[in-house]
């Protein structure tokens, strides 16, 4: 029997206060799975409090002392106040999402930022947003259901990459599950890629495990031949990652810093990282990145850029949307 598309939704994310992108995604997940397609600020605070009662590690207690705190009324009241303040802060950030995603955000938020609701009539781009939301929430998705999300996410990333590259560029998936151009052992695939980008590979097959069919940190590869066969062409490599917490480490997997010692080209290639998370925020009245201190030298395409680029370039959203997952999530009718 197939497992439900989502699990353990009553448990808030084990995330710090500053990881607003994870908390807001949790709110949106609770909203689309709710029997009335809504979720409130009070419900979030209650979920955090219930988790704190059953888990010794309150995710919001970032300055906890080593010693166990005394269990008294004042401590509990202070903790509840902190949970309510955090819930209010998260819903305030949803106002930011409402602003920047505009009509493409599949939710509505009341004027006091107390309750979020799913819009009654969802467009294809709304459903694509929800597909990205589920892809960004794999900790709540049974592992056997991941592929239906991650495969389409890589396809969506490839379609965006095609639009970002100049006319005439070659853009191909390299990930083991998606490619038809690069097949077989990883060494053989890297050898073919090296020829495509007119470089040299300082590796031998003996350097790899005998049955290595991985992707070497590459999910999408692109280059432009510039009309001849000489070295020195524009190249770009990309990694696609759905992890909500491990993305700082994955961001540079496709970069020259990791691969450049073995795959040599006349100049360094551009590095892209595609993520379904929304890391946008406002700082000092200007759009900025959350967690920017964790960024490496990569061009990041997050959920906001996905949605805006898909609409700007008229990329059909339906073929890269996990419709079955979205429909099943909305049909869970949880409280």
List PLM regions with ranges.
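Nuclease-adjacent, charged terminal/linker segments that flank catalytic cores
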Residues: 1-152, 335
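Histidine (H) residue identity feature
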Residues: 18, 34, 83-86, 93, ...
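Alpha-helix initiation/capping motif
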Residues: 22, 36, 40-44, 179, ...
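Generic structural signal of hydrophobic/aromatic residues within well-ordered alpha-helices
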Residues: 134, 186-197, 259, 322, ...
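Catalytic centers of nucleases
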Residues: 149-252
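Active-site/pore-lining binding-face segments in mid-to-C-terminal subdomains
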Residues: 227-292
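Domain-level recognition of nuclease-like catalytic cores that cleave nucleotide substrates
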Residues: 265-335
